[in-house]
Amino acid sequence: MIIQTKYHGEVKIKEEQMINFSNGIPGFLDQKQFVILPLSEESPFLVLQSLKNAELGFIVSSPFLFFNQYEFDLDETVVEILEVEDANDVEVMVILTMESSIEKTTANLRAPIIVNRKNMKAKQVILHDSAYHTKHLLEVASSC
């Protein structure tokens, strides 16, 4: 399947690469199918690209690359929705707001994206009782 993307133009993807958000993403409830693409070969950043809207591509990354102490408990309801059987099948990503320099780039740690890589079901989870916010500066020194 060939899709149009925000950052890479036309890209060929396989059906098994498609990630399904059954309820969409907050603010984009009609966008239910995405694919994860590398931003570039050397970059730790990825693109969560909508299959339906070429202009909708979020820059994402593993939070653990920049925030060593990042942790939260995944609600049992989310585990059931995503049909998680093994914690090793779960991938956690956070949406980044890219700025002019990496030192000014922020991560939304309040609303991580959880992907079950076994069945490709995903959900953006809002951590209500959390010390995390929507704009945490990346801890660049710890990732270098």
Curated annotation (Swiss-Prot):
The organism's lineage?
Bacteria, Bacillati, Bacillota, Bacilli, Bacillales
The family database entries (InterPro entries) matched by this protein are listed as: Flagellar_assembly_factor_FliW, Flagellar_assmbl_FliW_dom_sf
At the top level, the lineage of the source is Bacteria
Family, according to the entry, reads as follows: Belongs to the FliW family.
GO biological process annotations for this chain's record? bacterial-type flagellum assembly; regulation of translation
Main localization (coarse): cytoplasm
Q: Which organism is it from?
A: Bacillus pumilus (strain SAFR-032)
What is the annotated role of this protein in its UniProt record?
A: Acts as an anti-CsrA protein, binds CsrA and prevents it from repressing translation of its target genes, one of which is flagellin. Binds to flagellin and participates in the assembly of the flagellum.
Give the gene name. fliW
Q: What is this protein called?
A: Flagellar assembly factor FliW
Fill in the subunit field for this protein: Interacts with translational regulator CsrA and flagellin(s).
Q: Does the keyword tRNA-binding apply?
A: no
Keyword list (alphabetical) reads:
Bacterial flagellum biogenesis, Chaperone, Cytoplasm, Translation regulation
